[in-house]
Curated annotation (Swiss-Prot):
Residues 81-176 form the Toprim domain. Keywords: DNA damage, DNA recombination, DNA repair, Metal-binding, Zinc, Zinc-finger. InterPro entries: DNA_Rcmb_RecR, Rcmb_RecR, Rcmb_RecR_Znf, TOPRIM_dom, TOPRIM_RecR. CDD domains: TOPRIM_recR. Belongs to the RecR family. The gene is recR. A zinc finger (C4-type) spans 58-73. The lineage of its organism: Bacteria, Pseudomonadati, Pseudomonadota, Alphaproteobacteria, Hyphomicrobiales. The keyword Metal-binding applies. One of its GO terms (biological process) is DNA recombination. GO terms for molecular function: DNA binding; zinc ion binding. PROSITE patterns: RECR, TOPRIM. May play a role in DNA repair. It seems to be involved in an RecBC-independent recombinational process of DNA repair. It may act with RecF and RecO. This is Recombination protein RecR. Pfam families: RecR_C (PF21175), RecR_HhH (PF21176), RecR_ZnF (PF02132), Toprim_4 (PF13662).
C-alpha cells in the first residue's frame, strides 16, 4: 500500500537505486529533501541538471569533468612521464584526496572479471597501451585493488606492456598505517612480509 503520491514514490524508488541506500534510507532521504525544499532540494536539482548538461568523460584518461581533456590531464604541474592506472574514477579521486600522485591517470572502467563477463574489450586497456608507447611516458603504476580481479588485470596489462619502453610498477600491499597485525588476514600479512623495505 502506497503511503504517498506516485511522484514521491518515484523519488523514493530512484533514491533507492543509489549505492548504499536501501528502501528505508531512500524514504528518509526523500522526506529530508522534501522538508528542506529550498535549502536542499532546489540546489540539488540544479546541481543535477548542471551535471547532466556539462559533465563528460575525459577522452584522454577516462576521468569525469566538465571539460575534455580534464583538469588533471591539462595541469602543467603533472608529471607526464608517469601514468597511474586505476579501475574507476572513485579510485582516482581517492588517490587525489591522499595527494599520493603527481602523475597523470588512466581509468580502465573496471577490472577483468571472466565470471562477470568483463573482458579486455570492455575496458580501456587498448588506449592505455597506446598511451604507454608515447615517448614522454616512462612509468606505468598499476594502482589496482588487491582482489583476484585486480591482480588478474594487473598481470594482463603487464604482459601487454612488455614491448613498451616503460617501467611497470604496482602499489605495495600490506599492513595499513595504524593497523594491528592480530587483525590482519594471512594474505595481507604474507604480502607485507614479501614486500618489506629497509627501515
Amino acid at each position: 500500500m502506497a503511503v504517498a503520491g506516485p511522484e514521491i514514490e518515484r523519488l523514493i524508488q530512484l533514491l533507492a537505486r543509489l549505492p548504499g541506500l536501501g528502501p528505508r534510507s531512500a524514504r528518509r532521504a526523500a522526506l529530508h529533501l522534501i522538508k528542506k525544499r529550498e535549502a536542499l532540494m532546489v540546489p540539488l536539482a540544479s546541481a543535477l541538471q548542471v551535471a547532466i548538461d556539462r559533465i563528460q568523460v575525459c577522452k584522454t584518461c577516462g576521468n569525469i569533468d566538465t571539460q575534455s581533456p580534464c583538469t588533471v590531464c591539462t595541469d602543467p604541474r603533472r608529471d607526464p612521464a608517469m601514468i597511474v592506472v586505476v579501475a574507476d574514477v572513485a579510485d582516482l579521486w581517492a588517490l587525489e584526496r591522499a595527494k599520493a600522485s603527481n602523475g597523470r591517470y588512466h581509468v580502465l572502467g573496471g577490472t577483468l572479471s571472466p565470471l562477470d563477463g568483463v573482458g579486455p574489450q570492455d575496458l580501456t586497456i587498448d588506449a592505455l597501451v597506446q598511451r604507454a608507447h608515447a615517448p614522454e611516458v616512462s612509468e606505468i603504476i598499476l594502482a589496482l585493488n588487491a582482489t583476484v580481479d585486480g591482480q588478474t588485470t594487473a598481470h594482463y596489462i603487464t604482459d601487454l606492456l612488455q614491448e613498451a619502453n616503460v617501467k611497470v610498477t604496482r602499489l605495495a600491499h600490506g599492513v595499513p598505517v595504524g593497523g594491528e597485525l592480530d587483525y590482519l588476514d594471512e594474505g595481507t600479512l604474507s604480502a607485507a612480509m614479501r614486500q618489506r623495505t629497509l627501515f
